[in-house]
Amino acid sequence: MEFKLEAHRIVSISLGKIYNSRVQRGGIKLHKNLLVSLVLRSARQVYLSDPCPGLYLAGPAGTPAVPPPQQPGEPVAGPPSGWGEPPPPVARAAWPEPEPQPQPQPQRPSVCHTPGAGSSEPVAAVAGSGEALRGGEEDSAAAAWGRVERPRAASSGGGSDACPEGPRAVRRPCGCPPAVEERSSEDGSPAPPAPCPRKRGAAGVGGGRASCSAPGSTPLKKPRRNSEEQPVTGEDDTDEEMETGNVANLISIFGSSFSGLLRKSPAGGREEEEAEEGGPEAAEPGQICCDKPVLRDMSPWSTAIVAF
C-alpha cells in the first residue's frame, strides 16, 4: 500500500509539472515527452507490482503472461538454422547448368569445370576468367573509341570551324539561333543573353537584363521568407495552445484513472485523502474527483496503460 501511495505521489507531481509548464514558453516541447514517459513508467510499476491484480482488472493478469512464452520461443526458432542447409544444394544445382553452354565456346570450359576439380584448379580458372574479362573490356573500349572517333573525323572533314561548333551546339539546349552567337564571337563583343530559361538565372546573378533578373533575383525571395515566417509563428502559438489543451486532457484522464484505482482498493479512506491532496498539485479538483460511473468509463484507459 505504501508503494502505491508513493507511485501516486510521483504521478501527481509529474502531472503538476506538466500543468504548470504552460507558463513557460516552450517548456512543454522540452519536458512533455520525459514527463509522459515518467507517468507511464510509474503506471506500469503500480500495475505490475500489485500482488493480486485480479481484484482491480482482469487485463493486467493476462498481459504479463503473454511475453514469457514468446521469449524462449524466439531463440529456439529454427528458421536461422534451417537457412544454412538448403543453400549448398542450390549452389550445386547452379554450377552444372552452365556446363552445356561452353561446349560451342572454347573460352569458358576452363571456368565451368574448375568447381568440381579441386582447390588448386579454381585459382587458374579465376586467372583465366580475369584475362577473358580484360580482353572483353579491351574490345568494348576499342569499339566505343571507334564510335567516338567517327563523328570527330566527319566534323574535321567539314572544316576547321567545325570543332568549336560542337560545344556551341551543346550550349544551345533550348533551340537558340546559332547565327547570333557566331556573329558576336566574330566581332569580339560579348554575346547578348539568349531568351533561354536556363540563362535567366545566370543573367540575374551576373547583373544582366532587368526582365531576366526579376524572376531569379534574391530580393524577391526575402519578402516571401518574411511572409512565411509570420504564419509559422502564429502556428507555433496555436500548437502551444493545442498542446496545453492536450496536457489538460492528459491530466483529467490519468488523474481520474489513478483515483479510481485507488478508490477500488479496500483501504479507501486513506487513499481518497491522498488523491484529494494530490488533486490540487496535478490539476483542478473537479477533474480528478469524479463520480463512480465516470470511473467505470475510464477503466479502458488503465488497460491501455498496461498495454503500453
Curated annotation (Swiss-Prot):
General function of this protein: Plays a role as a transcription factor. Mediates positive transcriptional regulation of several chaperone gene during the heat shock response in a HSF1-dependent manner. Mediates negative transcriptional regulation of CDC25B expression. Plays a role in the dephosphorylation of the heat shock factor HSF1 and ribosomal protein S6 kinase (S6K) by the protein phosphatase PP2A. Involved in the regulation of cell proliferation and resistance to thermal stress. Involved in the cell cycle checkpoint and survival in response to ionizing radiation. Associates with chromatin to the CDC25B promoter.
GO-annotated molecular function: identical protein binding
Protein family: Belongs to the IER family.
Region feature (Disordered): 63-247, 259-287
Composition bias type Low complexity, residue spans: 73-84
UniProt feature, compositional bias: Acidic residues: 234-243
Domain of life of the native organism: Eukaryota
Recorded GO CC terms: cytoplasm; nucleolus; nucleoplasm; nucleus; protein phosphatase type 2A complex
Pro residues: compositionally biased ranges: 97-107
Summary of subunit composition and partner proteins: Monomer. Homodimer. Associates with the catalytic subunit of protein phosphatase PP2A. Interacts (via N- and C-terminal regions) with PPP2R2B. Interacts with PPP2R2A, PPP2R2C and PPP2R2D. Interacts (via N-terminus) with RPS6KB1. Interacts (via central region) with HSF1; this interaction promotes PPP2CA-induced HSF1 dephosphorylation, leading to enhanced HSF1 transcriptional activity.
One Gene Ontology term from the biological process aspect of the record: cellular response to heat
Cell location: Nucleus; Cytoplasm
Triggers of expression: By serum and growth factors.
Name of protein: Immediate early response gene 5 protein
Keyword Acetylation: no
Broad class of the protein's primary localization: nucleus
Alphabetical list of InterPro entries matching this protein: IER
Alphabetical UniProt keywords: Activator, Cytoplasm, Nucleus, Repressor, Stress response, Transcription, Transcription regulation
